[in-house]
Amino acid sequence: MIDVLFLPEPVSQQHVCVVVDVLRATSTIVTALANGARCVVPVRKIAEAKKRKAENILICGERKGIKPKGFDLGNSPIEYFTVKDKEVILTTTNGTRAISMINSQKLYAACFLNLHAVIEQLRNHDHVTIVCSGQKGKIAYEDVLCAGAIVYELNDKLTDGARISRELWKQSRRKDLSKLLFESQHAQELAEYGFSSDITFCSQTDLYSIVPVFVEDRFIKQAP
């Protein structure tokens, strides 16, 4: 059975969950790990992130799209090409909040950048819940679209949420993904802040072949 939650809610189960925040937290997590970060530790609050500052630890994230004062990096995935051997502490408006609400047997991070790597990982599991992070408590088109792309490739029983997301992807999958993302409300807000290049970057499919898996309090690369 595959379920898709359009907005985050407390999830506690002995199955597999996938968190999706295309713009931009899970895209940033995937990019950081693909470029050699030791791990990505999601935290809820800015103060909590700052407490963890130390050598070889980067304090990263955003509030209202903007890097907080004193942080090393924002939430733009294109800032994470030079994080080899660093521990990344990440706090964001939507993605890390969604992550904090999930308690599951396994938790993976997905976006378009690692789409088929996640799909292949999920073929080994019978029960999957995909949690869309949304944007400020509202449904985010790009997250539901990505969830639908995952569901589309998996032959299993579907909840109504999974069926809706799959149908959205079926109607959209032959269209220009970058153009689709730019039309989303969240993308338009990011573009106003000057992050158009992030939207273009996050619309790439299968740029990376890694799957972040949550272990204890952090995301690491899933072992091959």
Curated annotation (Swiss-Prot):
Keywords on this record? Hydrolase, Magnesium
Which cysteines link up through disulfide bonds? none
Indicate whether Iron appears among the record's keywords: no
Q: Which cofactor does it need?
A: Mg(2+)
Is Acetylation there in the keyword field? no
Its EC number is 3.1.3.71
Checking Gene3D superfamilies in the record gives:
ComB-like
Pfam families, per this entry? 2-ph_phosp (PF04029)
Q: Name one GO molecular function term.
A: 2-phosphosulfolactate phosphatase activity
Superkingdom in the source lineage: Bacteria
Q: What InterPro entries does the database record attribute to this sequence?
A: ComB-like, ComB-like_sf
Q: Which reaction does it catalyse?
A: (2R)-O-phospho-3-sulfolactate + H2O = (2R)-3-sulfolactate + phosphate
PANTHER family xref list: 2-PHOSPHOSULFOLACTATE PHOSPHATASE-RELATED
The record's section on NCBIfam families has: PRK00886.1-6
Q: Which family does it belong to?
A: Belongs to the ComB family.
Q: Can you name this protein?
A: Probable 2-phosphosulfolactate phosphatase
User: What is the species listed in this Swiss-Prot or TrEMBL entry?
Assistant: Pseudothermotoga lettingae (strain ATCC BAA-301 / DSM 14385 / NBRC 107922 / TMO)
